[in-house]
Structures are given as structure tokens and as C-alpha cells.
Amino acid sequence: MTLSRETFTPENVMMREAKDGTVPAKYQELILKDVMQNSKIMQLSQYVEMDDLAKTFQVFLDGPGAYWVDEGNRIQTSAPSYKNITIQAHKLAVILPVSNEYLKYQAGDFFNVMQPRIAEAFYKKFDEAAILGVDNPFKFSLSQSSTAAGDDIQGDITYQNILALEDKITDNDNEPNAFVSKAQNNTLLRNAQLVQNGVVQSLYDRQNGEIDGLATVNLKSTNMKKGELFVGDFDYAYYGIPGTIEYTISNDAQLSTITAADGKPVNLFEQDMSALRATMTVGFMIVKDGAFSHLTPKAAAASTSASSSTGK
């Protein structure tokens, strides 16, 4: 008699029998689709197909690579500028507390419930790293790139500062194509007006979600302060997602990063809960400094400087 190994499928396995492994393909696809549709940096940046943790590819940076043809004369050509770059992926992990009742679900039902929560945790963490440089494993972020190129501006959201922010990009011979803002900036943007000869000019188009005619996305993060604004040429930002989404479920740990109503770390055993740890690999890089600029309110900039000087 030949014994066949049972195949792990969402239809025939209860979660208490499969506390670690790879998220079933159907739900991986849904999670990744959700992540890519909702991540602000993924909406704006260029996607790179990755089969491994690192990938080297060629990008076009400068120069038209074209020339005039004149019979009988020597032709002066303009060579395009290419660069070989390597994008590196890092493992991103999220931990979500779940009721032990969920372990009685079939795998399909469990991941159907958890899929949006996993995706949201992934894209929020990735955006904070790639845009703000918060807990950033990458060598790049919009914030870091702007600072490295000397393209930071301190001040309020005003008509003049928005234009100055864009000028930082065009002065580097790049073309801004999108802004990153946040919902709390909407009133500030509406008030960023210029009055000339009794005519009020505004750069903010709330109905179409644009600033100065450029697509604008709102990042939802407490780490991005009210009054902060990014603009850039996102043709020079790349991301990739190699590998699969893995998971582990445990109920014998204390979650130091998640607190209960009393402010204390969540103890899974005491509260009859489990923790779902999901991991994915994602890469991000910016291939050209001078493609992004960053507006920071003076109060926030002063607070950051004070914290740095005191070691807090």
C-alpha cells in the first residue's frame, strides 16, 4: 500500500493544525494586490520584477541618445547615460493579535478574515520606511534623498513654498510628477493662495486630488507631521517584491510592541489570544538624488533638532 502525503489546502486544514508555513497562493495574491494598490510609494514608483533578494538592472538617467544625420560630415553624437544599479530586498514582518477562536477556522476562512489586516500592516510599514525613513532597512527614502541633495525647505505650506519645492526638482533638471501629503494638510493647501490684481490663484485642486496639476496621495501616518509635504520625480524610485508570504502563529509570547487598554504589553496566554506573524520581502531604492524635495514646518524641524541634541 502506498501512502500519499496530504496536501495543505485552505479547504482541508484547520488553523490549529497549521500554525506555520506559507500563506496559500490565493490569499497571497489578494494580499499583494491589496498592498500594491494601497501603498503610496508603490502607487507612484516603478515596479521591478525580482526573483531573488537582490537584482541588478540598467536604468537610463540622462541624455537623449539621439543625433542629427548629415551626409558627408562627421556627426557629433550625444550619448545617453545609463547606470547599473542593484535593488536589495529586506524581510518585513508584522505581528497581529488574534482571538484563539480563529484557530478553529479552516485555513481559507482564517486568511479571508486576516488578509486585509495583513496587507494594511505591510503597506503602512513599508510606506513609513520608504517615504519618511522610519525604521528603514533600506539605504534610501524620500526624506534621506531630499536631505542628501540639499533640497529640504523649512517653512509653512504656502503658495510660494509649494512652487519653491517644485523648483528644487526642476533646478536639478528633473520633472516632478507627484506629491505626497496627508489629510491634515488639506486646509493648509486650500489656504495656500496668491492674490494678484484682485484675482485669487490656488495650486490645490481637492476635487481631482492634485497640487499644481500633479497627482497627490495622502499618507496616513502619525510619523508624518502636519505641514510636511514631499514632491518628486518618481520615475527614479523603484520597488520589487520577491519571494512568498510566510506566517507563524504563537500563543506563548508577550507582545512588547502592542499594548492593552491599561498600557501594558499584551500577554497572549493571559488573554486567550494568539499572535499571527507574517513576513514578506520587499525592495526599494532611489537611483538619483535631486529627484525629491521635502517641505518641513519650522516647529517640527526645531523639535527634531532639539531631540537630536539632547539624545532623546
What is the meaning of each model-derived region?
Residues 1-29, 264-312:
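Protruding loop/beta-arch "assembly-hinge" segments enriched in small, turn-prone residues
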Residues 15-94, 158, 291:
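Assembly/oligomerization interface modules of large self-assembling protein complexes
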Residues 22, 26-30, 36, 109, ...:
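Generic recognition of stable, solvent-exposed alpha-helical segments in well-folded globular domains
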Residues 60-61, 99, 182-184, 279-281:
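Structured loops at beta-to-helix junctions and adjacent beta-edge loops in soluble globular domains
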Residues 64-66, 185-189, 283-286:
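Flexible loop/turn segments at secondary-structure boundaries
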Residues 94-172, 294, 303-311:
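Alpha-helical scaffold segments that mediate packing/assembly in large oligomeric complexes
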Residues 153-270, 274, 280, 308-312:
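Extended oligomerization regions of viral-like shell subunits
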